[in-house]
Amino acid sequence: MLKTLFGDPNARKLKKFQPFVTEVNLLEEEIQKLSDEELKYKTVEFREALDKARNDEELEDILDEILPEAFAVVREAGIRVLGMRHFDVQLLGGIVLHKGQIAEMKTGEGKTLVATLPAYLNGLTGKGVHVVTVNDYLARRDAEWMGQVHRFLGLSVGLIQGGMNPEERKKNYGCDITYTTNSELGFDYLRDNMATAMAEVVQRPFNYCIIDEVDSILIDEARTPLIISGQVERPTEKYLQAAAIAAQLLKQESEDDPGDYEVDEKARNVLMTDAGFEKAEQLLNVQDLYDQDNPWAHYIFNAIKAKELFTKDVNYMIRNNEIVIVDEFTGRVLPGRRWSDGLHQAIEAKEGVEIQRETQTLATITYQNFFLLYPKLSGMTGTAKTEETELEKVYNLQVTIIPTNRISRRYDLPDVVYKTEDAKWQAVAGEVEELHHQGRPILVGTTSVEKSEVLSKLLQQKKIHHNLLNARPENVERESEIVAQAGRKGAVTIATNMAGRGTDIILGGNADYMARLKIREYLMPQIVMPEDDDLMAGVSGNGGRRPQGFGTSKKKGKNWSPSDADIFPTKMSQETEEILKEAVKFAVEQYGQQSLTELEAEEKIAIASENAPTDDSVVEKLRVVYKAIRKTYETVTDQEHDEVVELGGLHVIGTERHESRRIDNQLRGRAGRQGDPGSTKFFLSLEDNLLRIFGGDRVAGLMNAFRVEEDMPIESQMLTRSLEGAQKKVETFYYDTRKQVFEYDEVMNNQRRAIYAERRRVLEGLDLKEQVLQYAEKTMDEIVDAYVNPELPPEEWDIPNLVGKVKEFVYLLKDVTPQDMEDMTVSEMKIFLHEEVRKAYDIKEYEVDQIRPGLMREAERFFILQQIDTLWREHLQTMDALRESIGLRGYGQQDPLIEYKQEGYEMFLEMMIDIRRNVVYSLFQFQPQGQPQTV
């Protein structure tokens, strides 16, 4: 109703941006006539225009003025370098991103190409643009692929990958446009704020950021804070004992059942009953689980959580005798990440693997607060409209839906629901068998490694050849190979949580990728250094995904052939094979036998498969071969493409509704890309987690009401409504959790900003003497206020103890006596001590600088940073403890958040006072050795 009255707000926004698009189109012909040199010179002209800006506001105005011409230049560069022309809808997406909004674009609409427009425009300012993706592989792919456009136009392109050293990071962050992942970016920020010298700081001040898969980073990952931690000693036997006790405690199955503990699956928490406490205390032979000298409660709670809420092959996997976390949203393993607060150790104890040391938080920030540090933020995703309210409230980001370039021909079939999970899997296998015989490609999405293997076994029994894509290492290695052929005729692919996978499924198969793979097979063994294989192990990052044409690390001696020889649609002709061997031989002559790193070799293949101008003769030869191989393969894939389209395109099967409708939509979005036909269907059961946890009693009632056979699907409007209701409930529940995390973290965030700003001032400050003197004067004032009450008569003032305390802090004031201060007022005392402490500091400085000139300046910086870091670490722990206990205030009719803000603020002020006092004390106590020493 409102839409018809006021018009669609989304359409209004698009209408406002349309004139820009028209202008870009009008400039196209003129820009086409420019030579490569003239096109590149446009960058210089734009930069000269931007140099005239006197402030940030003027800079934004000039960017808006040059936008149409800059976009027209990027569009032309895209055609010349990549052979890709930005559609009008992609230009619209670029404008939305430049305006600091979220562009919602469907899968297959070329989001990666869209980002080149605002990245180039904002990169012209020289202040740095960060393009953020969800993993190392996508960052590398985009930097090498899209980066060619920027490099061609004269902008520098940087790439941040796991395993890079600080020098490389600094150099790459210094570029005009830097491609990176959200976690690398966040951890570099935290590390920069732990640096002990400016030379160690790798990032510049933040300017503009474009987040790919923005919903996955700002919403799915918002609940998980980034944490840098140091190790602390904790007794491992306590974890083992707690695991043994948790195994003996019984879960409460119903209200009347006594049980030892309740499990709240919704809040992912456990609550022990009185009987449980008693039983645990008896088994441990202790009086009280909360005894301060020998606390057990924390260990027991974690052990029960590990037993009830964390399932092997769903939440984690065991790899090389270690517990590795599986990301619940992407189905990928997260090597190196650990659950905090002793939970990881509890799971290690449960599974009987080696228990690693517990950690203490040194620095932490949530993605929510991290990305709010950017003055201008934007993002792209296929699905954001469902979370629009949250994106607007928390991040102040508007969502604009960009129309698709071609009309979608995807057909979403109604859900079918089975009574039991077994019946559901049988039905899925039946559907796959039927469509597979017709020759349609099928993609089945599952929610965990375990479930994908259940289906895989059923298909093996039916003798249906299929590919499995989940977090197991042997499958991760082949990810891009599997996706490249997922659209071929009759292909069956089972994928775990395929959200944000970055590689499109092309009907008929991806000839382009297969041609690159063929070149890799011949070229890599000849030109890649064998010893690089180990070095690269750290670089592949998140789960070692293999990108399109950019490989991951190899174990020594592993061959470069694809793991599935049938991947190639047809054999190469003898003639093509000869040219390929010639090109490889030529590459060896030019570069030397096994002389390149794997990354360098991958980059050569990547450039060979694009149209970027190159002066490398090897790349030119490889390009000729690449085109020949691709042409051979296309004779098969093009024909298959037409056959598959005729059959109805890719069929996507969902096997469980995800907690978030958005992830379901991402899976559906794999079918019907760029106007191709396709269909989707969800198979569910009344035993699925979502229905079990959030569907509640209504569904249980329905189960009994439907007296149907196990293998009969239930189709009912009421059930579909229950499902959507359950999903909305979950989304609201998680939104509230995130909002709460955000509100509480906001308190920490203000404190973090203050402490990091102080720290940065110290790092950059050339002369910290004045700062230390102010610390000293404030400390003197505090001592006076502590011992002198102006409301009492002067004869009752405790001046002897006041003087004693002053000498305790500053031994150089040993000559000050109570008599010196007898007849002074409070303010006179303070002025007197200010003068004395300044004199004492000059003496101290003279003594220290006798050892080595300038040593006092170094000591000042060292002690201030040391105190900030040590006390901030302790403060993080006390704030954590406060946060955990504050929830109970709700029972006392107080608002826990207000209490947390109040007490947190008081604790922060105390910490700042402690930092000041400790610095003053440490500097006056500082006794450098006779030898020159570095502090």
Swiss-Prot record:
Keyword set, alphabetical order = ATP-binding, Cell inner membrane, Cell membrane, Cytoplasm, Membrane, Nucleotide-binding, Protein transport, Thylakoid, Translocase, Translocation, Transport
Region ranges (Disordered): 543-568
GO molecular function per UniProt: ATP binding; protein-exporting ATPase activity
A Pfam match: SecA_SW
- Quote the protein name from its UniProt record: Protein translocase subunit SecA
Reaction catalysed by this chain?
ATP + H2O + cellular proteinSide 1 = ADP + phosphate + cellular proteinSide 2
Which Gene3D superfamilies does the record associate with it? Helical scaffold and wing domains of SecA, P-loop containing nucleotide triphosphate hydrolases, SecA, preprotein cross-linking domain
Query: How would you classify this enzyme at the top EC level?
Result: translocase
The organism is: Rippkaea orientalis (strain PCC 8801 / RF-1) (Cyanothece sp. (strain PCC 8801))
Q: Which superkingdom does the taxonomy of this entry point to?
A: Bacteria
Q: Name one GO biological process term.
A: protein import
